[in-house]
Structure formats: structure tokens, C-alpha cells
């Protein structure tokens, strides 16, 4: 449902977009996510925005769940992106769990053992792991120089500002 809303929003702004089923171009082999880049590149070459999502995908064992976050990281790598944007419902990664008062946004996270301590409290946020998984599912991609940026996509204008390089509140993640 969310995917259709996103595609509809793009189309209403005269931005050509199409829903691309994750199962049509992604599978897992030997525990590794394999993305067939042709569908993505073909749409991008035609200036059409592919909109995909986390889903159940085929694997050599059976079926597995692939989060939208991991899909974004892996797609960025095969497409040669420098940064992955994560529009969230919060302003970024906080220095304390949500239930603790006086929390502050961490502007930049450089992955280290200490990072694990900060993110442990966020595992409960959603079924695929919350902020912890959002960041750690991209470790291999981060190691290759791709950055992540987590920001609040519900703030009007934030998505546009993030994509055009304007300064907004959020968390940069790098290795």
C-alpha cells in the first residue's frame, strides 16, 4: 500500500515512477543478496523512478525476508551511488533510547564498537530491526565508501532538501 502511495505522489508531481516488485530482480544465493541490475538501470536510463520495497524473496534455501533498508544499500552499491537516503519518522539517530529524556540527535556516526551501544536500544522499533538493522545491514556498502543519511521524511520539504543537498537535521552514517 505504501508503495502505491509513493508512486502516486511522484506521478501527481509529474515525475515518472513505476512500482518495481523486489521479487522480479532480487534473490539470495549462499546467504548473499543478488540484485539483477538490468531492471533498475533500464528504468533509470529512461528517466523513470523505480519504487521498490522490502519483501519476501526467493533464496537457494527457500524464501527469506529482505528489508527495504538492505535493498536500498545493495541497490546503491550496484548503481554506483555515493549516498543512501533513509526518510524516516524520526529526525535521525538519537544518543539515547526514545523512552529516556534529554536525548539528542547524533549528527555523524562513524561505525565502530561504540556505535553498537548507541543502537542496541532501537532494535524493537520494527520487525526488521529498526535503526540498528537500517545501519548494520549496510556495513559492507559503507566499507566501500557509500554514506547513509537518516532524516525525518515527514517534515514538509525535507525529502526535497535532502536530495538537493540543503542542510537539514539528520544523521550521516559512514565507515
Model segments located where?
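C-terminal catalytic "cap/lid" subdomain
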Residues: 1-175
Amino acid at each position: 500500500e505504501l508503495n502505491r502511495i509513493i508512486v502516486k505522489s511522484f506521478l501527481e508531481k509529474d515525475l515518472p515512477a513505476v512500482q518495481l516488485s523486489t521479487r522480479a530482480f532480487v534473490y539470495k544465493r549462499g546467504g548473499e543478496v543478488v540484485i539483477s541490475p538490468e531492471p533498475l538501470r533500464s528504468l533509470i536510463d529512461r528517466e523513470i523512478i523505480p519504487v521498490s520495497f522490502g519483501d519476501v524473496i526467493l533464496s537457494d534455501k527457500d524464501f527469506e525476508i529482505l528489508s527495504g533498508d538492505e535493498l536500498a544499500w545493495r541497490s546503491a552499491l550496484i548503481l554506483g551511488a555515493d549516498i543512501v537516503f533513509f526518510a524516516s519518522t524520526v529526525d535521525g539517530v538519537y544518543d539515547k533510547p526514545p523512552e529516556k529524556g534529554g536525548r539528542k540527535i547524533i549528527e555523524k556516526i562513524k561505525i565502530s564498537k561504540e556505535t553498537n551501544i548507541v543502537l542496541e536500544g532501537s532494535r524493537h522499533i520494527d520487525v526488521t530491526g529498526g535503526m540498528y538493522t537500517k545501519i548494520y545491514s549496510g556495513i559492507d556498502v559503507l566499507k566501500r565508501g557509500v554514506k547513509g543519511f537518516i532524516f525525518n521524511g515527514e517534515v514538509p520539504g525535507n525529502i526535497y532538501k535532502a536530495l538537493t543537498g540543503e542542510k537539514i537535521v539528520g544523521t550521516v552514517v559512514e565507515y
